[in-house]
Amino acid sequence: MRIILLGPPGAGKGTQAQLICKRYDIPQISTGDMLRAAIREGTELGLKAKSVMESGGLVSDELIIGLVKERIAQPDCENGCIFDGFPRTIPQAEALENAGITIDHVIEIAVPDEEIVKRLSGRRQHPASGRVYHIEYNPPKVEGKDDVTGEELVQRPDDLEETIRKRLGSYHSETEQLVGFYQGRAASGENAPTYNKLDGLRTIDVVQKDLFAILDETK
């Protein structure tokens, strides 16, 4: 069972991916992790990737697909996997298909932009411990202070509204196109992944219940 989760940053994909991994005993595959592992192990593809990256270039889709094929052939992927951060573009999705890598489920977790901004820009962190708060959903006992130490909380650069809106812009211009791509594939029928859209405004538990219902049908 190979799964792709789509949705904007902050939609809850990471949380749901962890729950899926635990329930179905499948790994979450990150292209970044694959690249780092291949470079560390000195594999042929890893050495090629290292050379490209050291020269300031972008690792090609062809090379990434090669890494994906190596990764999914490993024993822990026998029951399937969740793709994390890949594909990001239609050419990458087409490259997956052309390499004969089948996808069983594509699930979109939909959340409006303004809710994403609210979720992410409200986060505050205690740098020393990594404890994370939210000014509305999980506020500290004393505004701006860590509950344990009383030290100042900070807003990470990634959680600034300007940064969030830039990330959303990138999502809409690139990755969101995959929604239409996979909807079309699902409609085509034979050997196509299923496509489902879930309302990410609901609680984690409710979204999880719907996700599991979809995946249990074809387990």
From Swiss-Prot:
Pfam hit, one: ADK
Region entry NMP, spans: 30-59
UniProt signal peptide: none
Main localization, broad class: cytoplasm
Highest taxon, organism lineage: Bacteria
Naturally occurring in which organism (per UniProt): Acinetobacter baylyi (strain ATCC 33305 / BD413 / ADP1)
Binding site for ATP: 10-15, 123, 132-133, 202
Main EC class the enzyme belongs to: transferase
One MF annotation (Gene Ontology) recorded for this entry: adenylate kinase activity
Quaternary structure note: Monomer.
Record keywords, A-Z: ATP-binding, Cytoplasm, Kinase, Nucleotide biosynthesis, Nucleotide-binding, Transferase
NCBIfam families: adk, PRK00279.1-1, PRK00279.1-2, PRK00279.1-3, PRK14527.1
Record's catalysed reaction(s): AMP + ATP = 2 ADP
GO biological process, one term: AMP salvage
UniProt-annotated location(s): Cytoplasm
Family of the protein in this entry: Belongs to the adenylate kinase family.
Region called LID, residue ranges: 122-159
Binding site for AMP: 31, 36, 57-59, 85-88, 92, 156, 167
Pathway entry: Purine metabolism; AMP biosynthesis via salvage pathway; AMP from ADP: step 1/1
Protein name in the entry: Adenylate kinase
UniProt-listed InterPro entries: Adenyl_kin_sub, Adenylat/UMP-CMP_kin, Adenylat_kinase_CS, Adenylate_kinase_lid-dom, P-loop_NTPase
Gene name per UniProt: adk
